[in-house]
Amino acid sequence: MFDVTLLILLGLAALGFVSHNTTVAVSILVLIIVRVTPLSTFFPWIEKQGLTIGIIILTIGVMAPIASGSLPPSTLIHSFFNWKSLVAIAVGVIVSWLGGRGVTLMGSQPQLVAGLLVGTVLGVALFRGVPVGPLIAAGLVSLIVGKQ
């Protein structure tokens, strides 16, 4: 039996490798393994909890320098007195807000996820971008199409 979904996943994984987007490629390969094994029974759980777990892991990675001490408290305090750091804080707030809108949009309009993924892969492949923005991209899309 021909599995179109598997073919699409393989194509997206190939795009991930070609564009040096190993995060996307490895993620898709893991999903392929889940799909073709008895682990496929976990898909409802992955669909429900995957994004939350991913955000938790991402937050751990971002906060690790503070927790490890490699980013000393004095540096954090000084960030409130430098105009460039204040701009960075403001942009961080805006981007976090956009990411929140993106999560809502991806949950309510999952058909947009494929377009966001293809756009991210193309951005990495054609413009030497970095694959960090699907949630932010979804947030920007929500500003255009609405987040319902």
Curated annotation (Swiss-Prot):
The chain crosses the membrane at residues 14-34, 51-71, 80-100, 121-141. The gene is yeaL. Its main location: membrane. It is a multi-pass membrane protein. Belongs to the UPF0756 family. This is UPF0756 membrane protein YeaL. Keywords: Cell membrane, Membrane, Transmembrane, Transmembrane helix. It holds the Pfam family DUF441. It is found in: Cell membrane. It comes from the Bacteria. The lineage of its organism: Bacteria, Pseudomonadati, Pseudomonadota, Gammaproteobacteria, Enterobacterales. GO terms for cellular component: plasma membrane.
